[in-house]
Amino acid sequence: MTESLGSEDAISYKPIDILLVEDDEMDIEVTLRAFEKGRIRNNLFVVRDGQEALDFVSGQGQYQNKEKYPRPDLILLDIRMPKLSGFEVLKSLKADPRFDFIPVVMLTSSKNEEDVVKSYGAGAASYIPKPVSYQDFLKVVDGFNFYWQIINKLPNGKDKSSERALKLSSWI
């Protein structure tokens, strides 16, 4: 099951496709409300376990329709989930050259330092412990915006990875 969220009166930018991988309904609701409250018009898709995340990203099973389920530009990933853990999903994504460029943000209730180190070691772009208030979550999203638009150096070439980077650089 997926939810897609958009806002017509949001600030003008090119929306990106974000995949939230989360099994806790309350955390899903908090994220949806934070996007709504912040008038973030990116497309947010939600899957509820690790295997479903890999199916979504690779376009397998019910996610074969790429118009309806596009490859995500950013993944928000919980660690503790059914079927496959967030670590297993992260390792699988980073081991596959088709998906290793997708930034993965660990958004999890674990504040364990070992999990932080393990996440970065497996290729996470960021680690955000929950609970995150709406305001704090919006600051995080704003921080990504600053990173992609101001700090990140983009390649001069025009290949698929540059186009993806250019798309990412324009979000929020």
For every predicted segment, state its role.
Residues 46, 83-84:
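Residue-level signal for the "D+5" position in two-component response regulator receiver
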Residues 125:
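Short, glycine/charged-rich "phosphate-handling" switch motifs in NTP-dependent
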